[in-house]
Amino acid sequence: MTIESLAPTDALPWHLRDNWAPVLDERTDTELRVDGVIPPELVGTYVRTGPNPASGTSGHWFFGDGMLHGVRLANGRAEWYRNRFIQTPNISDPLDDPMAGMGDLTRGTGNTHVMAHNKQLLCLEEGHWPWRVDTELNTLGVQDYGGELTCSMTAHPKVCPVTGELIAFSYLSPEPPFLHYIRISPDGQLVQLEGIELPNMVMMHDFNVTQNHIVFMDLPVCFDLGALETGLPFKFDRDAGARLGVMPRNGANADVRWFEIDPCYVFHPVNAHESGNSIVLHVSRQKEAFGSSNDDYAEVGRLWKWTIDLDAGTVTEEQVDDRPGDFGRVDDRLVGLDARYGYLMAMAGEGNSEEPVYGSAFWKYDLASGACVEHRLGDGVRGAEPVFAPASTDAGEDEGWIISIVHDTNSDQSRLVIIDAQD
């Protein structure tokens, strides 16, 4: 389904045409066709979110209303598919200018990431509070942790597999200290909201967590009102420098140690872990971001390894591979621990400033050796973020499946793929 428009398709911005075009109808389909075999032990609901303007138009990719797509798997069957708008005030009372709602924390879209914590499904983006939905994709309301959360929350919190804590942060603040650290208990209570001093506001899309530390990425996509005319008030400024901030997980601003690195940008790290008195990070690093405008995605990330030596006060920066990839994940049971395998989506379209181009493969990296195994999706098939589902609660690492919704540009159809992670 695509938006109908009187304008020629090629006259629309890239995020409103082809597979990016808004889906305006909500639907529920049952007893879905299955090609191949769904493992009978794979039981649960796959849910993804993405920007999907309910009005049919938006000024920037990032501003579209959140739409959820879910597929329920059980007993070797795909029982249902459904898509639902996240019912935020932006649906019932839309604003002409999305930036006008930045001060109202209820006006989130939930269009960037979905995750579970404390038996709740959270839909997130980085400028507002999360929104809660149930397993049928019905909207339940905002999550402000009993009124204790007084700032926005990142789209990419981490759930510690050891303690069950939700670790998060917030960067969208017009006033110092420009960054806040957020820690939520396993039962959903806000236990820490800590101001972290930065020299200015930067677009900190994601961060890193280990068993004992937080690693913030102060990278030079800086607040710049002059850039607002291209969609967002942020601009890459190499002269601002780049650094990593290491803090104990229960620490405060005074405990942060900063380590300078070469200027770059990272939308998504893959994982981080401790090794002796060092912290090892694997990230999808790109040379810069938003080159000609805030709608320029010509730069793509590649897998890099950063090793922070806490004794020497240094960072070693190493490129692991030259293949472009992003949206990296590990087994959620190993977030912040020494995971061996990372799963990334290939990126295409390097140098194409007109639109982002998702690749036609998934990469599985051995993070210890840097070796990479490719899974081809097929010519003209575009991937999405790969999610690992273990075969059982006690299955070993890499014993399970990679799940994602991919799009076939040849047939203009999307499908859920389930791939044996070891095949």
Positions of PLM-derived features:
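Beta-propeller domains
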Residues: 1-423
